[in-house]
């Protein structure tokens, strides 16, 4: 039986020494939402709880200000 390699999860924000996540940094926020627009849970991304809360708040702010879409484009 083949065993697959599971990559170790780590918090990117802790590794980079980020103090506060910025809601205007769309490139970073897009990495943490799915194609359908949902926020990816920390058990998948490996983000620490402190940064996951900040991330959720920033994504919601960016959505409210129309920087990020609430959902994908339905066609």
Curated annotation (Swiss-Prot):
Part of the 30S ribosomal subunit. Forms a tight heterodimer with protein bS6. GO terms for molecular function: small ribosomal subunit rRNA binding; structural constituent of ribosome. HAMAP family: Ribosomal_bS18. One of its GO terms (biological process) is translation. InterPro entries: Ribosomal_bS18 (IPR001648), Ribosomal_bS18_CS (IPR018275), Ribosomal_bS18_sf (IPR036870). Belongs to the bacterial ribosomal protein bS18 family. This is Small ribosomal subunit protein bS18. GO terms for cellular component: cytosolic small ribosomal subunit. Binds as a heterodimer with protein bS6 to the central domain of the 16S rRNA, where it helps stabilize the platform of the 30S subunit. Keywords: Ribonucleoprotein, Ribosomal protein, RNA-binding, rRNA-binding. Transmembrane segments: none annotated. It holds the Pfam family Ribosomal_S18.
């Amino acid at each position: 039986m083949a065993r697959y390699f599971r990559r170790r999860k780590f918090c990117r924000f802790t590794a980079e020494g980020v103090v506060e996540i910025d809601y205007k940094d769309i490139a970073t926020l897009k990495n943490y939402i799915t194609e359908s627009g949902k926020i990816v849970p920390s058990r998948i991304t490996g983000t620490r709880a402190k940064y996951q809360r900040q991330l959720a708040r920033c994504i919601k702010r960016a959505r409210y200000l129309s920087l990020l879409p609430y959902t994908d484009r339905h066609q």
